[in-house]
Amino acid sequence: MTIAFLDVAITIEYVSTAISLVCLPINILFVYILFVERNRPPYNTPFFRLCIHLSIADILMELFSTFFFKFPSFGVFPSTFYKENWSVVPIAGMQYLGHAQAFGIIFIAVNRFTAVHYPIKHRQQWWTPKVTKTLLLIQWITPLFFMAPLFSTDFKFLFSHNSGSVIFAASDARFHKNYFLAMAMVDGILINLIVLLLYGAIFIRVHTHVVVRKPGELALRLALSAFIIFICYLALGVCSLLSALTPPPDAWVYRTMWFVVNDVLCNSSALVLLALNRPIRKAFTRHLGVFSYQGVSTKNHNSLLQAV
């Protein structure tokens, strides 16, 4: 790789890290607002319960990846920090939080799918508090099974301060290749395919059947939200696949790309919902003290919020 390419890569990662840290308070405040408003319509719906937990996973992933991978790459932490017996913990943590995000994305897509295709059963039968709690337990417990195999081996880390990236390799080369290739296929192919099919079905239904006050605006909001989520996960999956297919010593460039895309993904949920939904923006600014509280009209905004 040329020196110019290295300079561009490290600059992009520095910029994405700085922007993510600036956006972190916004994400935290977003979760706080949804939590405070959780018993007030329309925020007392399963959709916003799922949003809270997805945003928590996003925040934890951003903090974890920054402190355990980026800062050592930037020279903030000494590399000896990763030469102890617990070297598997950073990798396991990333796998756990990444799949917690993935399940959150899938469950939100399923929620939107049932809301559009089966609105009556969606409200009255399927999305009960018990079902929502069960899905949230699945979101946080199932990733444990994805990261469990990692504890059967050790990892070695090599931090490149020139590229701002990190290379890690399991002591068992065969395990390293098989495990990360399998995870890359799950994240990059299976999850993206599921989300794409669900949102594709939503778009078709909204375009041909659903009647709302502003159908064009609703379709645009749905399309933009789904597009950002899908593109982020698609790009993340491509980086994961390329990294898994590349020998560890040569995989640094894909790891750098992965961390940049991950920064975008971790900040997309809160920012997209704030950008595309006026009631959420009003609640956000009200808690900042910009506007006084006048309540949220569920009559005017419920259908729009339910469609995001």
Curated annotation (Swiss-Prot):
<feature type="transmembrane region" description="Helical">
    <location>
        <begin position="184"/>
        <end position="204"/>
    </location>
</feature>
<dbReference type="Pfam" id="PF10323">
    <property type="entry name" value="7TM_GPCR_Srv"/>
</dbReference>
<feature type="transmembrane region" description="Helical">
    <location>
        <begin position="46"/>
        <end position="68"/>
    </location>
</feature>
<feature type="transmembrane region" description="Helical">
    <location>
        <begin position="222"/>
        <end position="242"/>
    </location>
</feature>
<comment type="similarity">
    <text>Belongs to the nematode receptor-like protein srv family.</text>
</comment>
<feature type="transmembrane region" description="Helical">
    <location>
        <begin position="88"/>
        <end position="108"/>
    </location>
</feature>
<dbReference type="InterPro" id="IPR017452">
    <property type="entry name" value="GPCR_Rhodpsn_7TM"/>
</dbReference>
<feature type="transmembrane region" description="Helical">
    <location>
        <begin position="135"/>
        <end position="155"/>
    </location>
</feature>
<keyword id="KW-0472">Membrane</keyword>
<protein>
    <recommendedName>
        <fullName>Serpentine receptor class V-1</fullName>
    </recommendedName>
</protein>
<feature type="transmembrane region" description="Helical">
    <location>
        <begin position="15"/>
        <end position="35"/>
    </location>
</feature>
<dbReference type="InterPro" id="IPR019426">
    <property type="entry name" value="7TM_GPCR_serpentine_rcpt_Srv"/>
</dbReference>
<dbReference type="InterPro" id="IPR051119">
    <property type="entry name" value="Nematode_SR-like"/>
</dbReference>
<keyword id="KW-1133">Transmembrane helix</keyword>
<keyword id="KW-0812">Transmembrane</keyword>
<feature type="transmembrane region" description="Helical">
    <location>
        <begin position="256"/>
        <end position="276"/>
    </location>
</feature>
<dbReference type="GO" id="GO:0016020">
    <property type="term" value="C:membrane"/>
</dbReference>
